[in-house]
Amino acid sequence: MEPVTASTTATAKPTLRVAAFCGSLRKDSWHRGLIRAAEELCEESIPGLRIDHVDISGLPMANPDLETDGGEGFPPAVEALRDRVRAADCFLFASPEYNYSVTASLKNALDWASGGRRNCWADRAAAIVSAGGDFGGGRGSFHLRQIGVFLDLHFINKPELHIRAFADPPKFDDEGNLIDGETRERLKKVLLSLHAFALRLQQHKED
C-alpha cells in the first residue's frame, strides 16, 4: 500500500477549506499555537489544505430566545459563524481539556452552529488535536468525539495527537508557538489524514 503523503493526497485535487476552532480564548494558548502551526504546515507542504481560523470569542451564549424567524435567523456573530461552518470542507478542533470535558466556548460554538432548523456541521470530516498534562487533553477530546456523534461529524481515528505539554523537551514557547519538531511532524500526519479522509467523503457523496 502506498504511504499517505502530501503528494499522493493533493495531486490534481481541489484545495479543501479547513475551518479551525480553538477551544481556548487565551491569547497565548498552546491550542492557538497548534492552529498557527497547522497554517504554516499547509502553506509549506500540504497544498491541498487551507486553514481558516474561526474566532469564536465574540459569540453570545447560546440562547434560543435570540433566534428569529422560526429558527432561521440568528445574531450577526452567530450568522457569521454558521456561514463559515457551512463553507468548510472539513474541520480542525484544537481543544483543551477543562474538567475532563471541552471548554464552554467551544461547546457554545458547537451549539450555535447546530441550532435552529439546520445543523451546519453535518456529514464532514474532522480532526482533534490537544495539549495538556499527563493525558495530553485526551479526556476532553474523547468527550468532543461523543458530542460529534449527534452532530454527524466524522472524526479521523488515527493518528491521534494528545501532547504532554509539560514533558521534556519543551513543546511550546511563552507565546504558545509550537517549537518541537517531532510534535510538528505528528501534527502534519494528522492534517494529511484529515485531508485524505475528507476527499474520500467527498468522493462518496459524488458517487
Please provide the spans of the model-predicted regions.
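Glycine-rich phosphate/pyrophosphate-binding loop and the adjoining helix
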Residues: E2-P14, H154-D207
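N-terminal beta1-alpha1 ligand-phosphate binding loop
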Residues: A12-P47
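A general structural signal for well-ordered alpha-helical segments in protein cores
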Residues: V18, H31, I35, V78, ...
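A generic structural motif
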Residues: E43-D52, H154
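N-terminal beta-loop-helix "entrance" segment that forms/cooperates
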Residues: H53-G73, P169-K171
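Helix-loop-strand module that forms the ligand-binding subsite of alpha/beta enzymes
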Residues: G71-D152
